[in-house]
C-alpha cells in the first residue's frame, strides 16, 4: 500500500498547558475544526472527547495522553491536506510523567497560556521538560475573553520566567468581553470569526484605525526575527526594508525549528476564536518528522546507530503508552521512527529480548478507533497483541535490531498502604494494581516484607487517589487507604575506608571473602556508583560482580531507619581470597558487611523530599499563607503579583504538606489554590530525623 500523506505533511504535536489554561477545550476545537467531532465537547459539562476516562470527566482535568489523528487544509483551504497526530498531555502536576513521555514521541508542541494567569508553575515544569527534549513550540494565549486578560503581560512573562524568545505573529483586537478577533501581522489584516458557524467561517477586514501604529511596530519586530534566520533573508530585508509573507514564514519556521523563537498567537477556544489560525501556524512553523534529526540508538554489539524518518529504512518504533481498552484489551501506543509495520508482522523487543506478533493496528480518535493495515515512518498508532512491551520499550525489525534511547522515570515520593475492603478481593486487587503499574511507570506496587501490607507509591496524593479510584471503577475493587508515608532516604557525609570479612573455615568446604572499600558521598542525584580499583588481582576478576551485587542488595536498607541509601560512591581497592574456600557468595557477604559498617562510620544522615510549592492567594490572606508555610518548615523563595492575587513560592518538606489542601481552604475561605511538585532531597534537621528514627 502506498503512502497516502507525504511525510513532509505530517505533524506530531502535543498540546501542553497549566491545569486551567484551557488545553482540553483547545484540543476539542482542533478536533471540531478538522472535522472529526461534530458536537463540541465542553470540559464544563464533562463531555470533552479527549478526556475519556471517567474520573477526568468528573474532575475536569486531563489524565491520560490519548493520541488522535486528524486532517487540516488550512483555515482558507489553501494548504494541501496535512495529517496531524495530537498527543493529549495532562496539565496536572502529579502527572508530569505523562507529559514527559508524550514529549518523547512528539515533534512539536502548542503551549496554551491563560491570558489571565499567564505563566503558571506547571507551565514552567512542562516548558523545562520540552527544553530537555528540544521540542519546537508555538505559544497560544487562550481565554482572551476573560476578565483580566492581558496578552502583553503573558508576552513579558514568557521572556522573564521561561527565558524564551516569543515572537507575536498576531495581536488581539480588544480584550475581556470586548475581544473580537486578531490582527494577522503577516497579512496585516484583521480576522473576525463568525459566531453563528461556531467559528467555521471568518472574514478579513481592515485593521482598526486605533491599532494600525501598534500593528506596524510589532510587524517590524516579527520581520526582523524572520530575517535573522539566514544571510539570504537578512540581505533581502536590508535591501528592500521588508520581506514577503512567504519569506517571513520561511524565516520564522527555520528559527522555530532551531528552538530560537516561539511564534505567539492568541484567541479564545471557548468562544471559537483563534484556534483555526493556530492550526495554520502548526503547518507553517512546527516540524514534520522529516525535519527532525535522526533518532539515536544502539545495535546489539553496543555500537551507535541511528534511524531516519524514511519508509525505506528498517522498522523501528517506541512504545510510549499502555492503555486498557474494554473491547480489545491492552493497547500499546507507539511512534514509528523508521520503516513500515503491517498488522500480522513479527517485531522484536530488544529490551525484553523477545519477538512478538502485532495483532491488529488501530488509530485512535480519543476513544473511538479505526482499524488500519499498516503504519509508516513518522506516524503514531496503537497495537493489539503485544504482551511483553511496556512504556519506553523499543519495537524493531528482528532482522535489524536497534535499541532506542530509554526514557528515564522519576522515583515516587509518597507511599500509602492499601488493603481491599473484603478479603475476597485480595487477589483481584493485586491484578488491578499490577495492570495499573504497567500503564504508568511512575506508579509502583510492592509488598512490605515485615507487615505483609501492599504499599503503593506515586508522585503525589492526587496521583494515588486516582489510582485507588480507577481500581474501584475499572476492576470493581474497593480499598481502604492508610495514612501517606514519606519516601525518606539515607546518605553519608564523610569518606571512610572499611574492611569486610566473611570467613567460615571449620572443616569441609569453607567460606572466605575479604574486601576493603572506600565509601564517599556522591553528587546529589547521582545515586550509587561502584568503582573497581583492584590492582594485582587481590580480589580475582570473577568475584568483582559479586562484590557489586552484595553492595547493591544492601542499599535498600540503611542503618539509621532502614530507608534506601542514595548518592554513595564505593571503590573496591583491596582484599584477599582463598584458592579453595572463596566463592561468589562469600564475597557478596563480605561486601555487605563492609557497607553496613561503613555506613555507621561515615556520618549517616536522613534525607527528606522537598517540594516546590506555589500558592495563589488573594492579597488579604497573604499573611496567613506565609505564616502557615513557615510553620510547616517552609522556606519562602519569592513572591509575585497577579491581578488581585499574590503568588507565594516556597520550598517545603513533603512530610509537612499532608492535608495542606484542607488547611489552605480554611485559612483563605477557599479562595486560594496551590500546586506542588517534587524538587530534590535535602538533609532533614536533627530533631526531625531523630523523631523518624525513633519510630522505626
UniProtKB/Swiss-Prot annotation:
Residues 8-290 form the tr-type G domain. GO terms for cellular component: cytoplasm. SMART domains: EFG_C (SM00838), EFG_IV (SM00889). InterPro entries: EFG_II, EFG_III, EFG_III/V, EFG_IV, EFG_V, EFG_V-like, EFTu-like_2, G_TR_CS. Belongs to the TRAFAC class translation factor GTPase superfamily. Classic translation factor GTPase family. EF-G/EF-2 subfamily. HAMAP family: EF_G_EF_2_B. Pfam families: EFG_C, EFG_III, EFG_IV, GTP_EFTU, GTP_EFTU_D2. SUPFAM superfamilies: EF-G C-terminal domain-like (SSF54980), P-loop containing nucleoside triphosphate hydrolases (SSF52540), Ribosomal protein S5 domain 2-like (SSF54211), Translation proteins (SSF50447). The keyword Nucleotide-binding applies. It is found in: Cytoplasm. GO terms for biological process: ribosome disassembly. GTP binds at residues 17-24, 88-92, 142-145. Catalyzes the GTP-dependent ribosomal translocation step during translation elongation. During this step, the ribosome changes from the pre-translocational (PRE) to the post-translocational (POST) state as the newly formed A-site-bound peptidyl-tRNA and P-site-bound deacylated tRNA move to the P and E sites, respectively. Catalyzes the coordinated movement of the two tRNA molecules, the mRNA and conformational changes in the ribosome. Gene3D superfamilies: 3.30.230.10, 3.30.70.240, Elongation Factor G (Translational Gtpase), domain 3, P-loop containing nucleotide triphosphate hydrolases, Translation factors. One of its GO terms (molecular function) is guanosine tetraphosphate binding. NCBIfam families: EF-G, PRK12740.1-3, PRK12740.1-5, small_GTP. The keyword Hydrolase does not apply. This is Elongation factor G. Keywords: Cytoplasm, Elongation factor, GTP-binding, Nucleotide-binding, Protein biosynthesis.
Amino acid at each position: 500500500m502506498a503512502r497516502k500523506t507525504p511525510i513532509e505533511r505530517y505533524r506530531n504535536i502535543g498540546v501542553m498547558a497549566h491545569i486551567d489554561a484551557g488545553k482540553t477545550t483547545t484540543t476539542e476545537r482542533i478536533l471540531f475544526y478538522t472535522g472529526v467531532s461534530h458536537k463540541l465537547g465542553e470540559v464544563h459539562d464533562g463531555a470533552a472527547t479527549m478526556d475519556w476516562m471517567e474520573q477526568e470527566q468528573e474532575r475536569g482535568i486531563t489524565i491520560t495522553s490519548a493520541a488522535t489523528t486528524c486532517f487540516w487544509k488550512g483555515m482558507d483551504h489553501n494548504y494541501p491536506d496535512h495529517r496531524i497526530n495530537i498527543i493529549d498531555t495532562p496539565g496536572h502536576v502529579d502527572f508530569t510523567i505523562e507529559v514527559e513521555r508524550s514529549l518523547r514521541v512528539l515533534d512539536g508542541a502548542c503551549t496554551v497560556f491563560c491570558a489571565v494567569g499567564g505563566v503558571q508553575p506547571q507551565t514552567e515544569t512542562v516548558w523545562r521538560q520540552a527544553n530537555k527534549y528540544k521540542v519546537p513550540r508555538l505559544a497560544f494565549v487562550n481565554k482572551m475573553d476573560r476578565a483580566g486578560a492581558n496578552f502583553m503581560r503573558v508576552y513579558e512573562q514568557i521572556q522573564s520566567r521561561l527565558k524564551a524568545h516569543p515572537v507575536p505573529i498576531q495581536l488581539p483586537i480588544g480584550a475581556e468581553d470586548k475581544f473580537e478577533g486578531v490582527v494577522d501581522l503577516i497579512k496585516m489584516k484583521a480576522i473576525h470569526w463568525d459566531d453563528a458557524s461556531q467559528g467555521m467561517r471568518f472574514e478579513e477586514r481592515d485593521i482598526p484605525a486605533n491599532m494600525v501604529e501598534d500593528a506596524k511596530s510589532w510587524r517590524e519586530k516579527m520581520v526582523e526575527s524572520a530575517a535573522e534566520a539566514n544571510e539570504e533573508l537578512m540581505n533581502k530585508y536590508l535591501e528592500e526594508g521588508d520581506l514577503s509573507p512567504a519569506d517571513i514564514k520561511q524565516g520564522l519556521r527555520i528559527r522555530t525549528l532551531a528552538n530560537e523563537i516561539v511564534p505567539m498567537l492568541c484567541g479564545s477556544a471557548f468562544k471559537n476564536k483563534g484556534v483555526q489560525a493556530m492550526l495554520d501556524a502548526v503547518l507553517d512553523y512546527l516540524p514534520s518528522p522529516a525535519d527532525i534529526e535522526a533518532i539515536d540508538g544502539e545495535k546489539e554489539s553496543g555500537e551507535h546507530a541511528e534511524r531516519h524518518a524514511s519508509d525505506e529504512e528498517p522498522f523501528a518504533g517506541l512504545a510510549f503508552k499502555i492503555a486498557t481498552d474494554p473491547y480489545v484489551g491492552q493497547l500499546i501506543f507507539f511512534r514509528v521512527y523508521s520503516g513500515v509495520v503491517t498488522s500480522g508482522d513479527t517485531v522484536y523487543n530488544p529490551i525484553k529480548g523477545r519477538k512478538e506478533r502485532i495483532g491488529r493496528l488501530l488509530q485512535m480518535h480519543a476513544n473511538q478507533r479505526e482499524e488500519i493495515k499498516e503504519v509508516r515512518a513518522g506516524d503514531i498508532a496503537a497495537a493489539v497483541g503485544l504482551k511483553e512491551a511496556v512504556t519506553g520499550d523499543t519495537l524493531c525489525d528482528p532482522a535489524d535490531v536497534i535499541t532506542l534511547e530509554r526514557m528515564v522515570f522519576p522515583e515516587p515520593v509518597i507511599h500509602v498502604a492499601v488493603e481491599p475492603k473484603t478479603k475476597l478481593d485480595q487477589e483481584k486487587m493485586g491484578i488491578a494494581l499490577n495492570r495499573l503499574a504497567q500503564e504508568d511507570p511512575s506508579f509502583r506496587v510492592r509488598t512490605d516484607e515485615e507487615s505483609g501490607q501492599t504499599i503503593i507509591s506515586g508522585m503525589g496524593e492526587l496521583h494515588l487517589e486516582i489510582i485507588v479510584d480507577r481500581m474501584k471503577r475499572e476492576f470493581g475493587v474497593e480499598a481502604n487507604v492508610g495514612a501517606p508515608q514519606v519516601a525518606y532516604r539515607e546518605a553519608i557525609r564523610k569518606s571512610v575506608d572499611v574492611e569486610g570479612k566473611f570467613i567460615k573455615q571449620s572443616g569441609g568446604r569453607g567460606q572466605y571473602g575479604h574486601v576493603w572499600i572506600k565509601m564517599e558521598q556522591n553528587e546529589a542525584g547521582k545515586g550509587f556508583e561502584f568503582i573497581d580499583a583492584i590492582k594485582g588481582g587481590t580480589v580475582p576478576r570473577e568475584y568483582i560482580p559479586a562484590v557489586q551485587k552484595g553492595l547493591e542488595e544492601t542499599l535498600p536498607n540503611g542503618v539509621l531507619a532502614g530507608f534506601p541509601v542514595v548518592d554513595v560512591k564505593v571503590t573496591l581497592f583491596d582484599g584477599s581470597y582463598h584458592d579453595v574456600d572463596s566463592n561468589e557468595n562469600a564475597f557478596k557477604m563480605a561486601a555487605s558487611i563492609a557497607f553496613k559498617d561503613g555506613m555507621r562510620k561515615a556520618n549517616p544522615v536522613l534525607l527528606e523530599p522537598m517540594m516546590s510549592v506555589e500558592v495563589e492567594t488573594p492579597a488579604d490572606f497573604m499573611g496567613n499563607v506565609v505564616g502557615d508555610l513557615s510553620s510547616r518548615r517552609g522556606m519562602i523563595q519569592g513572591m509575585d503579583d497577579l491581578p488581585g492575587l499574590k503568588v507565594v513560592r516556597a520550598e517545603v518538606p513533603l512530610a509537612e504538606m499532608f492535608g495542606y489542601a484542607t488547611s489552605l481552604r480554611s485559612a483563605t475561605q477557599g479562595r486560594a489554590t496551590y500546586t506542588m511538585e517534587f524538587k530534590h532531597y535535602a538533609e532533614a534537621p536533627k530533631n526531625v530525623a531523630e523523631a523518624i528514627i525513633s519510630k522505626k
